[in-house]
């Protein structure tokens, strides 16, 4: 086996940066360490430091740190240190002591050794090294390929490879979640993941070249090239990171069936678009701007009309402009190359650069404020021209759209003015929108290019998203990011600890399941649930006047004090203001909500968007083509989601994308990578403790440790534990005796002095609490030290003894050598010895010569043989080479064929498996889709219903507002409503009758629906979910109703306030009326003068209108002239340019002529002609220039003259305009006041009408319930009478049943023997339990599924046992039949038995086949776990278990044979059988539990054999049948047993009911009646089954099984129906009493309402009569006024013109009375008018003198006129009398008008008081009804609880599914009818509203006529006064003339 260092050699130069060497590990383990005194201690500056405990006193610990400090801290501030062997451990979850300082220092020490990757349980934590490390080299990629996680050091490649291998083996999508703060290395790790997949799964196929011939690459190149492009447009420099990703992304890499790359796509989230227009001082904008300006591609500078200096552009120069670590020029080339590789067309590429340049130009757009206005106007057009050119727009249209956007008001568009700041904000928003949409569009295009249309099998998703952020200033973006991390942490907790706890469950450890994912639920719900932060934010965005303050107030009202996660922040000095705090899992974050509403709405200038949509740049038009009709998806989703006409807020879009992301992640197997930034200064190797701890908390690493400590984080396999810790007590495990590892571990731990509550034994592992394993390690180290010390002593002793023996042997050898040397020295001079020395060599030489001769001969022979063999060898080698070549060729062919065959087989197997899986998935998805479609349809209908109800409620509110203002108009509408309600109640009665019939029909069709039980149960679950959702929606609506009630109370208070204001207004109006009268007297003197000036004013107004029209025409003409001037200028510029070109050409030609010298005469003539043409063109150009200048001068002069004239006219009209505007503003104020009053009153009225309608609906519902209850009571009475008649018969049957039950006691012995046998089998099954443990572990998923099936089967078994009692009666009835038919059926039973035996044999064969298949599956799983041998043992044990099952079945046969013999003895002993049956039931329950435990271990065999298991269960049940077959006997036995217990209960109920009350007797009789009908039906069905048995035995078994199931269901259904009827009866009785009480109260309320309406009608009639009187009086006044006017016209025809002027002046007078405050300004104008009028008076006096002259000329005719004068005097006297009479009449009329006013006010007050009283009565009644409704709701809630309980029971079986579905349809019909009802109510309300509007218009018309009559009376009075004066003057003149 290779050493660890040798294994690490495969990593090359990266090995030291990945894992410690073996030498370092040994040195670490040998470090001196004291586990009791070595600790971590809390330090004020460095968070934690290492130290040594000096002393402990009174809860305080004194620690000496490594730096020499001595600290005294509390005990809980000291943390134990891990042993040295855990130093730089690769997986921190394996540490003995899990706490913050241990994690921190492990990361720190590994980081100091440049090991930047560390595991922490499921996490991989990586620390940014801030330097290049050779850990991503190609050899590292290859070294990690195919390695398991524990086989290789921690690395991002290991995570990637594990995900890849899991995808291939588990056939499941994978995801890698990479999170961390900015600068922690998320993007780098993401790129490394993509690099790894692109390397190991490269398809190697070139993409097809497109026709355009643009640059293409492989799919791997394109995936890798997507990063530079996205980084250029989505990355920027921040304070912490020079290349920070300012967006999140989820990259999905799709693989084919063989694991090769198939395609990829990208989704992006939360692009920081605000960086486009603003950067902090130490940051800069996105890289692409600076890459373009790097001048690497000068053609871009020219194309984009920009410079190379970033400071020329405001948007990109607010921070830094260069980054030392980034070469913008190289990055530009990489970006440009990536665009080409990714397949963007040339036009698209140009559009990308142009739009980027346009964004830069946008930042330089300047605007200024117009003089004397707030309107913005462009300050120069050069920048706008550049931006418009790049965007394909018209510059003038762009500036106009920015300064004068068009806004839609109603159905019309209105031009709106913008201030400078508004325009700048609009430009910034547009720049950000263009950049963001372009970025998202590029992602879509990248996805289209990466979609190769190759078949996809699975994908691996890589999530690179910002980590948790806690800044000094946290805004909306931080909330979104933190919320995302909150959801991801919840996902991690759920995933990690669900797996952890599932392992506890799998290992059989007692553990209460804890959902750690719920730890974060409170914070998540606070943010995203209804009425959460996002919900309130979106709601505020819908209100036009909402502000940040109102948003904050709503947050406080909704959550402050109600949620622990929502807090009010404490103000801190030196920090930004915070408005609220949220308690996240990573800490408490203070948020500032400034500008959240605008950020969430993200408004854009729609006028500019319209220009974008018409842009000549197709890409820009495409970006905004669907603006307003499409919600933008995040990132790379193809297409978008329609959202209709409504806008989608940023928060809603963010939540939608987040939900999609979480759905994607939940469908995958996740892997987690947490990136850590070690320090703020980007210093390699340095680590700041507090910063790292903060990130560990934010990333959830410490949270994971916290939760991990609650469980058993350390676990060891039994074999490993036994081997490692046996040394602690070797005597507990004796040598030479085999002991199971689990038992050995239990004995070993039991013999050690440790806390035995700190560990648990699983099936395969022993689990330890945190810290206990470290204690065992310490004990093991101590024991090993002791053992090693003894071993060293023994070894040293043994070595010394060996050394001693060696020394003794050396001594003896030395003695021997010395002896021999001494002897030789003594004999070496002896002569004979010398002779021996001489002769001895000679003897050897003679022999050697002979040997040499022989050897030469042999050498020659051998040489010849060698030559021959060499020749043969060469021939053979040549042949061998040829054969080897042929062999290799054949082997290659065979290998190729084998590989291709294996690949084909593998692909075939994979395709078959894939097909099966896909078919199953398709089936599941289809079923789920159908269910979801049904749910969606139901939810959509419910949603529409709720929306309709909401809209109708709003409309009802509006209707009620009008109704409250005119309460007296409601009588007719109420009568119509009552009639409609009566009709609808009749319709509902008919509907209820129909529904009752349908219910009966459904009960009759009940048997047919039983076969669909399983499908319908699923539907019930979905319906229940839908119901819960609807209940939640109802709760939300109830909450909104409470808010509406609060709003109503506020409106009531506002109404009372407005009523007080109205009274004050009335008082002020009376004062104004008095002032008016006084002013009338003053103004009458000026009437004549005003009448003349008024005509002039009208003429001036007409002239002003004409001048305004003329001004507009002139302005239009000016614009046209300006356009013409501009055109002339352009043409002039062109002409100038053309002239310059011609002159330049002329000069060039002249130069050429001079150079040519010897030109011919023809050339000279041509030159002269050209010169003449040039001269002519110059003259034409000069003439055109002069003409243009003359035209321009004339136009300027004309424009100046018209401007001067218009200026004078405008000044004249301006004064008139100001006057009219003042009048208009005051009228608007009055109209607003009246509208607000009307609105408040109408709202209150709407609330009342709404309550009335709800009460009427409740009344109708109560009436229908009452009638239904009455019908049920009648039915129950009839049933009661019938049951009483049958009581006697059932009493007799009960006595028979008593005798029958007494016989059952004899079966006790048989049952007890059966129980003993089953217990014996149970013991055998328990013995097989351990053998099947490993098999169960590998098939745990299948076990879960089959366990659910088994539980269902056990429930069915329980139901069969309950049905046993029913079969007892059948046995009694069939006994006679069996006695008569026994002989005939014997043969049939024998045949059936043979067939059953054959089926049993087939089943056994099927079992064996399934066992073989299970074995193969087990081998596959165990091969992955290196446990093939264990699996074989498990399979054998499983076969043994099957044999045990067969044996068990035979025992059942024996038991049933005994039952046949003893069945006749079970008909006696009633009293004893009751007690014994109870004990028997408890024993059976225990047996059932034990049997369940045994069968839990056999469920692996049932996974592929569901049908077989069902057949075996059927056989087991069929064996119990007495006479027909073994299977029937088993069923009959269970039937009899269950029937016995149920009949006992029935008899007990019967006896109790006979002794106590008649009600219980009725229930018993109902139950017995149902049982009787069920038994009769079962007898008939059994007869049919017997007939079928004669025809086809196999079909009989199946039909009997189905029939038995039907009987069980029907019997349970009958019991349930009985209980349901009882519960319904009780509820209906309660509801009947409440309904009666409510009906009486409703009738009383109706009578009160009708009385109130009568009073209101009386008031209305009085008001109408008053109005008729006023009309008559007004008509009389009109007639008199007309007479007076006619007389005045007869007397003075010349005053007609004055009369017309007078009317106009009177109108002005009325306006003046309404504007008392403006009279002072008008008086000044009247003084000026007076001067003009004095001149007019002079003219009138001259005319008067002319008239006197005419009178003097008539003196000659005086005598003739004396009589006429006398007559005229008499007529004058009459006229004076008439005038006096009219004066009196006028006064009387004035008094009458005043009285009418008073009466009208009184009538209005009475109406208001009556309305108030009525309102108060209605409010009191409403409160009473609300109280009753609350009580009714409480009672209904209790009823609903009963209904829910009933529904839960119904879910278990069949009937209610169909009934619920029909109920839903019925409710839908009822909803439709109710909607029609609501619509009819709405129509009635509209009719009432129209009637009230007609009456209101009549009243206003009458009031207006009255005012006109008053005006005419005043006019008549003034005319009479004038006539009086003139008549006096004439009379005086006549008297003077007579005198």
From Swiss-Prot:
GO cellular component term, pick one: myosin II complex
Positions of post-translational N-acetylalanine modification: 2
Compartmental location: Cytoplasm, Myofibril
A Pfam family assignment: Myosin_head
Record flagged with keyword Methyltransferase: no
One GO term (biological process): muscle contraction
Modification type N6-methyllysine: residues: 36
Coiled coil: 842-1939
Top-level division of the source organism's lineage: Eukaryota
Boundaries of every Myosin motor domain copy: 87-781
Domain IQ positions: 784-813
Myosin N-terminal SH3-like domain residues: 34-83
PANTHER family cross-referenced by the UniProt entry: MYOSIN HEAVY CHAIN, NON-MUSCLE, MYOSIN-4
Domain comment, as recorded: The rodlike tail sequence is highly repetitive, showing cycles of a 28-residue repeat pattern composed of 4 heptapeptides, characteristic for alpha-helical coiled coils. Limited proteolysis of myosin heavy chain produces 1 light meromyosin (LMM) and 1 heavy meromyosin (HMM). HMM can be further cleaved into 2 globular subfragments (S1) and 1 rod-shaped subfragment (S2).
UniProt-recorded name of the protein: Myosin heavy chain, skeletal muscle, adult
